[in-house]
A protein has these predicted regions:
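Short acidic/histidine-rich active-site segments
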Residues: 151
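Hydrophobic alpha-helical transmembrane segments
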Residues: 1-141, 154-196, 201-271
Length: 271
């Protein structure tokens, strides 16, 4: 739900959706790109422990050599390549594929879908897809490829990049929309670590800065609406001291955060 909602917010912020048939087709392709392409890539990359089979490969010495060309001398480059390929094949069959095979297959298919849809949608979406893949790789490396993803990296992929995709698909991207996408991505990620006082302040502070932006842009009604939507999110904090988890908070605060995202996008389009 999050990526699709962020796409809608980006489209609204662009003020370029014309309600014509071709616009609806473009929006449908965009949702397929973000959910079917990026989403599948991200869930497959972040949901599997890639580090474990790679650690085993460092010390892997099993597997019969591949067939070598005639007259290949022992310990020659051809012989070493043959032994290395044999070890790689055995490691792939016995270690990598049982642990990571389904995810690897999903990544290959999702990558092909991403490339095709991005090409259909234009150069901007192709470049943004490449940037999204780079963010995914950074998030994966940050956690060491152990099958877990930090909430803020997840928010960048699930909120910020889809928002930017929605905007770029229907209009020229500006700093205003970029700033809003980043602010709400930060808040989205912080909600999953709200048991930390620092993350709590970060999540509320980023939304407060979004409201302050509209004060600077002389849109007090939008600023007031965003501040009003902060109230129920802050009102949930006492329940954390009563034993509720960060996941509980994120689930109950999300509707208010999503409403704030849409109001901010709508207000940005008219400025």
């Amino acid at each position: 739900m999050g990526p699709t909602w962020a796409v809608v917010c980006g489209v609204v912020a662009s003020d370029g959706f014309g309600w014509r048939g071709e616009d609806w087709i473009r929006l449908a392709l965009l949702v397929l790109l973000v959910d079917g392409g990026w989403g599948t890539l991200w869930s497959s990359l972040g949901g599997v422990n890639w580090a474990k089979p790679l650690r085993r490969w460092r010390h892997w010495r099993f597997g019969a050599p591949f067939a070598t060309p005639p007259y290949t001398l022992p310990n020659s480059p051809g012989d070493r390549i043959s032994r290395w390929l044999g070890q790689l094949g055995a490691w792939w069959r016995d270690v990598f594929w049982p642990a990571c095979g389904p995810a690897f297959s999903a990544i290959v298919i999702a990558f092909a879908v991403t490339v095709v849809l991005a090409v259909l949608l234009g150069t901007e979406l192709l470049l943004l897809s490449a940037a999204t893949l780079a963010v995914m790789q950074l998030g994966l490396a940050w956690e060491g490829g152990r099958g877990t993803v930090a909430p803020h990296w997840d928010a960048l992929v699930a909120v910020m990049m889809p928002w930017l995709a929605g905007h770029v698909a229907f209009g020229a991207l500006g700093l205003r929309s970029l700033g809003l996408a980043l602010a709400y991505a930060i808040s989205w990620g912080a909600a999953w670590r709200v048991d930390s006082p620092w993350e709590r302040a970060l999540g509320i502070g980023s939304q407060f800065l979004a409201a302050a932006l509209f004060v600077v842009l002389r849109s007090p009604l939008a600023a007031g609406g965003l501040l009003l939507l902060l109230v129920p999110q802050v009102a949930l904090f006492p329940w954390l001291r009563r034993g509720q988890s960060a996941a509980w908070y994120a689930r109950h605060a999300r509707p208010w955060l999503m409403a704030a995202m849409l109001i901010a996008a709508w207000a940005a389009r008219s400025l």
